């Protein structure tokens, strides 16, 4: 039981709430408390029926409980915590702004493409931003080889393409969102 208090005290606030929200949303769907049909993002339901929670839950549901959820949560804890801690002061507000901009950008993207659940695209965008803010890190890919951080998103795109056989257009759009955000916030004089 000492794990939960330690997690709460050591995880930055925005990352903590996203991780807990993802865990609770995924468990609620998997245990049948909520149907995934009630939480996926759909513009018609969002605008016409006023189901505004869908704009948040689309980023908090990963899929069936299993290895993908565990890997996703470990990613969030590791990379998003580092990104939140390295955000400019005040850290929590700066990182929350980043998360909200990425969420909004992905929601706009979902208007033009089918993206009922955006958690994986959100994590990919955050991975892209993290990789460029921490370019000297090396990440082990499947324990087979090491890659410098800026190349990790591209290796992930290639692995998804090889695994599914489907061109990962939405991953590339997520990378573009991350690139624009990184360029505007780190290189722009505006």
Curated annotation (Swiss-Prot):
InterPro entries: DER1 (IPR007599), Rhomboid-like_sf (IPR035952). It is found in: Endoplasmic reticulum membrane. The chain crosses the membrane at residues 17-37, 56-76, 99-119, 139-159, 164-184. GO terms for cellular component: endoplasmic reticulum; endoplasmic reticulum membrane. Residues 38-55, 120-138, 185-190 are lumenal. Its main location: endoplasmic reticulum. Disulfide bonds: none annotated. The keyword Nuclease does not apply. GO terms for biological process: endoplasmic reticulum unfolded protein response; ERAD pathway. Keywords: Endoplasmic reticulum, Membrane, Transmembrane, Transmembrane helix. It comes from the Eukaryota. GO terms for molecular function: signal recognition particle binding. Pfam families: DER1. Residues 1-16, 77-98, 160-163 are cytoplasmic. The keyword Iron-sulfur does not apply. It is a multi-pass membrane protein. Belongs to the derlin family. This is Uncharacterized derlin-like protein C1687.17c. It comes from Schizosaccharomyces pombe (strain 972 / ATCC 24843).
């Amino acid at each position: 039981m000492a794990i939960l208090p330690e997690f709460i005290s050591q995880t930055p606030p925005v990352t903590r709430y996203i991780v807990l929200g993802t865990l609770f949303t995924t468990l609620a769907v998997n245990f049948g408390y909520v149907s995934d049909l009630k939480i996926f993002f759909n513009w018609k339901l969002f605008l016409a029926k006023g189901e505004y929670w869908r704009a948040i839950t689309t980023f908090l549901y990963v899929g069936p409980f299993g290895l993908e959820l565990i890997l996703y949560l470990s990613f969030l804890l590791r990379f998003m915590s580092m990104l939140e801690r390295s955000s400019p002061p005040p850290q929590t507000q700066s990182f929350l702004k980043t998360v909200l901009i990425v969420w909004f950008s992905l929601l706009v993207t979902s208007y033009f493409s089918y993206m009922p659940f955006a958690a994986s695209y959100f994590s990919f965008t955050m991975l892209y931003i993290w990789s460029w803010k921490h370019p000297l890190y090396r990440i082990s890919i499947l324990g087979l080889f090491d890659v410098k951080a800026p190349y990790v998103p591209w290796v992930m795109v290639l692995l998804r393409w090889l695994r599914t056989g489907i061109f990962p257009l939405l991953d590339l759009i997520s990378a573009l969102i991350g690139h624009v955000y990184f360029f505007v916030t780190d290189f722009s004089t505006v």
